[in-house]
Amino acid sequence: MKDRLFLLGQHLLPHHLLSRAAGRLAECRVPWVKNSLIKAFARHFQVD
């Protein structure tokens, strides 16, 4: 179900908008946002 919602979002939103949103998140300097993204990345890709 989670995958279906993700794919639906990708088809409904313009790809350029998704790329820009991802870029904004990647450049974010707000500590709690930045740290949350780093932790999620490390957990997802099993980084030690």
Curated annotation (Swiss-Prot):
Source domain of life: Bacteria
Pathway: Phospholipid metabolism; phosphatidylethanolamine biosynthesis; phosphatidylethanolamine from CDP-diacylglycerol: step 2/2
Catalytic activity: a 1,2-diacyl-sn-glycero-3-phospho-L-serine + H(+) = a 1,2-diacyl-sn-glycero-3-phosphoethanolamine + CO2
Signal sequence annotation: none
Cofactor: pyruvate
Any one GO BP annotation for this protein: phosphatidylethanolamine biosynthetic process
EC number: 4.1.1.65
GO molecular function: phosphatidylserine decarboxylase activity
Details of cofactor binding: Binds 1 pyruvoyl group covalently per subunit.
Coiled coil start-end: none
Keyword line: Decarboxylase, Lipid biosynthesis, Lipid metabolism, Lyase, Phospholipid biosynthesis, Phospholipid metabolism, Pyruvate
Protein family per UniProt: Belongs to the phosphatidylserine decarboxylase family. Type 1 subfamily.
Entry protein name: Phosphatidylserine decarboxylase proenzyme
Organism field: Azotobacter vinelandii
Gene that this sequence comes from: psd
